[in-house]
Amino acid sequence: QAGPLLRRLAAEFCDSPLAARCTVALEIAPDADKAILDADAALLARAVENLLHNAACHNPGPVQVQLSAVRTGKTLRITIADDGAGYPPAVLHALQTGEAGENTPHILGLHVVEQIIRAHGGTAAFARNAPRGAKAVLVLPVTEDPAAR
């Protein structure tokens, strides 16, 4: 289930030394809480942890991070957004086009996130958060709960 996994990841992050650099707000919609994902929990955890780590480490000063999950039909949308500096334009360009120039910052962690989500039949999108900051949206297919049949 998605809800317990996301709550555990948020709690573990808040217990880590990186938590001193940010505040994490967790919001899981009731229909998303019990959504069942056909996913490797360790890999999905790595993707979310990478994004939380980026929010804490790639921003000056304290940053507010919002981790949320919403179910829409047969998909679960997990959003990690912050109010920090946001992704540099070169990073967004490299992620959207696959073309990394010599001045492109290191983006291996974001590529790992993309690969993990794609391997689970989903999509990962990275953008600037309005009015400021970075936003990653992970969309994953939800499997039907056999107990609900």
Predicted stretch roles:
Residues G86-H93:
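Short helix N-cap motif at coil->helix boundaries in the Bergerat
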Residues Q64-K74:
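Short beta-strand/loop element within the Bergerat-fold HATPase_c
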Residues D82:
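Acidic ATP/Mg2+-coordinating residue in the GHKL
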Residues N54-A56:
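Short helix-loop "hinge" at the ATP-lid/N-box region of the Bergerat-fold HATPase_c
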Residues S16-I28:
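Short conserved segments within the C-terminal catalytic ATPase subdomain
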Residues I36-A39:
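Conserved micro-motifs of the catalytic ATP-binding
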